[in-house]
Amino acid sequence: MNKVFKFLDDTFLDLGRQFKWTYLPPLMVYVAAGISGLTGIVGTFFVKDYLNLSAAFLAGLGFWAGIPWALKMPLGHLVDLIWERKNYMVYFGATLIALSLLIMYGLIIHTEDMSQIYSVETWFVISVILAPVGYVVQDVVADAMTVEAVPLTNEKGNHYNKDEIKIMHTTMQTLGRFAIIGGTVLVALVNVILFRDVENLEQADKIQLYGSIYIYALIIPLFSRLGVIL
């Protein structure tokens, strides 16, 4: 029993003891990435019930939506070049994510009004493309922020040695992974609660539920913006 407790203490509890407030900004952005799946189920229902898109078209759209992630490395170089203005990059990414969510909300709740401007399929494609661009931009900045988050001196002004700095970098990366996983688990629990007994709802109530989830999801860009403000 003592060995189990020691393992849990060394593996998990010690991470909490090593936490520093400077770690919080990138962790907020990572949490935002973790909860980004909140609208995944709703998006699936929307495609199935409202859009007449072929499997080939959706596969092609998935390819284009994945392009921003393939460009993560050159984007990282761009962040290095304009590092002093990194907050604008996060704001830009958060704005794209918010626009994507609001477009989907409009498509679900105000379908007729939106379709008078562009077709529903066109709006859906725009939303699908905007979101990954926003997430990639934020993810690149968060990765760079993890380096800045590790302090070089302690409270007394003494410099940390190389081993201590290496440990702090490892802790920061581990906490980042936990933040993403924690956000994902939280989203799973929220989806279970929100979609409980959804099959018994009237169609109008289902539409309102689907739309409200996209409004709830606006907390995602809010989290990332808070990470920069902090």
Task: List the model feature ranges, each with a label.
Residues 2-69, 130:
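Helix-loop boundary and gating motifs at the non-cytosolic
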Residues 27, 59-60, 91, 167-174:
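Conserved glycine-rich helix-kink/hinge and helix-boundary motifs of the Major Facilitator Superfamily
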Residues 45, 73-80, 188-193:
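Small-residue-mediated transmembrane helix hinge/kink sites in multi-pass secondary transporters
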Residues 1-22, 99, 103, 108-125, ...:
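Intracellular loop-helix junctions on the cytosolic face of multi-pass helical membrane proteins
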